[in-house]
Regions:
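Metallocofactor- and cofactor-centric catalytic cores in central/energy metabolism, strongly enriched
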Residues: 2-83
Length: 83
């Protein structure tokens, strides 16, 4: 049975980049799974695989909601996740 593919979306804080001083970071795909995404993968179990983590700063998303939403959803859809 194939694993269920998961994309994890997190903010700059949970990506380990910083707090409010880094909240203006534009959306990007993490090159390696941040620790919190690895923890999610472990918690989900063997039937799931976290295939991508998308990161975006809270302030950036809030101030650019329409364009940020399109960027983030595009990054998620590229990975063709099941969940």
């Amino acid at each position: 049975m194939d694993k269920i593919k998961v994309v994890h979306y997190i903010n700059q804080f949970f990506a380990g980049i910083g707090g409010e001083e880094k909240a203006d970071i534009k959306p990007f795909i993490a090159e390696e799974l941040p620790p919190i995404s690895s923890q999610l993968a472990k918690a989900l179990g063997e039937d799931f695989e976290v295939v991508r983590t998308v990161v975006c700063g809270d302030s950036y998303f809030g101030e650019n909601m329409e364009s940020a939403q399109k960027e983030v959803l595009g990054m998620i859809k590229e990975a063709n996740p099941d969940f």
